[in-house]
Amino acid sequence: MDDDDFGGFEAAETFDGGNGETQTTSPAIPWAAFPTVSGVHLSPPSPEIVLDHDHSSAIDCLSSDAIISSPENTHAENSIVSQTIPKAQIQQSTHTHLDISLFPLGLTDEKSNGTIALVDDSEDPGANVSNIQLRQKISSLEIKLKVSEEEKQRIKQDVESLMEKHNVLEKGFLKEKEQEAISFQDRYKELQEKHKQELEDMRKAGHEALSIIVDEYKHQRLLEMLDTEKELLKGKIKEALIQQSQEQKEILEKCLEEERQRNKEALVSAAKLEKEAMKDAVLKVVEEERKNSEKAHAEERELWKTEHAKDQEKVSQEIQKAIQEQRKISQETVKAAIIEEQKRSEKAVEEAVKRTRDELIEYIKEQKRLDQVIRQRSLSSLELFLSCAQKQLSALIATEPVDIE
């Protein structure tokens, strides 16, 4: 539906007449354009109006038939158009129709600025009569213009009221649709949460069942492996202890033999040193005594013998005492060495047992860690499988139409 259906309010256009003459531009509507003729032109404001008698019939025809329609026809046409035009087109064309004035308003403006002067090259005697008729028609046109202006204002008010009603209805419709969309969205969210919770429950149930089965299997397998490793470690510990005791026994025998040899050599060397020392001392004493005895050889010979016997006795006693002390020291040294060697061997055995126990614990921890890694991998693969299944279920749920009514 174009703009002519709403009363023909549109911008002025220029049309060419059928005889090739340029038509005057109507300020409001295209059908108000009329051809200009020779001797007729617009002039500045003038108190006189001269009309060409030859063209008076054409002007009368235009003024009576084509210049403007009656207020009743305009009102009927506008009422029919207002009933048939959709709301969207009324919105789009409201500003255009309200801003465009009618042709009679243009004539009124022209009249307010100055009167229309129609000048003919040759003056007729009936020009005064035509001027009077033209004045009467102009006055009637002014009355019709006022009526059309009032009709225009009334139409403008009707359009504004219709626009306000349309805006109110549109706001109510949009609010209702927004509330429906919010309710639909809430219901969709509830359904989505429900499906999500059901999928989560299914995933948790499957995960728990699988984790229980895997834990049972791992526990059984770990017990079997621990039993096997325990038997193997018992055999290894027994063999290691036997071998360690044999080695400790051999080392102890070697140490005792070496210690015995060292003690024997030490005793021999000590006896030799003591003997040499005593011999030197005895020789010195003998030399002194010999010198003294040379002076009193006869008297002191007996004394010297007795003293010499005493000295020999003392020397033998000292030698025996030194030998006994050396023997006690050697025995104590051997006992201390044996006790220390026993303690060392016991400590070595304890360290070997502790080291073996630590190695066993480390091995068990390593096995537990490997089992944990395998379990984590299994759980990760299961989690990946369940997430893929959840995505597929979400995709299937999204592709199916949701019954929201």
Swiss-Prot record:
Region feature (Disordered): 1-27
Membrane topology: Peripheral membrane protein
Any one of the GO CC terms: trans-Golgi network
Highest rank taxon of the organism: Eukaryota
Compartments, as annotated in UniProt: Membrane; Golgi apparatus, trans-Golgi network membrane; Golgi apparatus, trans-Golgi network
Transmembrane segments: none
GO terms (BP aspect): Golgi to lysosome transport; protein transport
GGA1-binding motif as annotated region, ranges: 1-16
Residues found modified as Phosphoserine: 43, 46
Coiled-coil portions: 126-376
Main location: membrane
Keywords, sorted A to Z: Coiled coil, Golgi apparatus, Membrane, Phosphoprotein, Protein transport, Transport
Protein's job: Involved in the regulation of membrane traffic through the trans-Golgi network (TGN). Functions in close cooperation with the GGAs in the sorting of hydrolases to lysosomes.
Descriptive protein name: Coiled-coil domain-containing protein 91
Organism: Pongo abelii (Sumatran orangutan)
Source species taxonomy: Eukaryota, Metazoa, Chordata, Craniata, Vertebrata
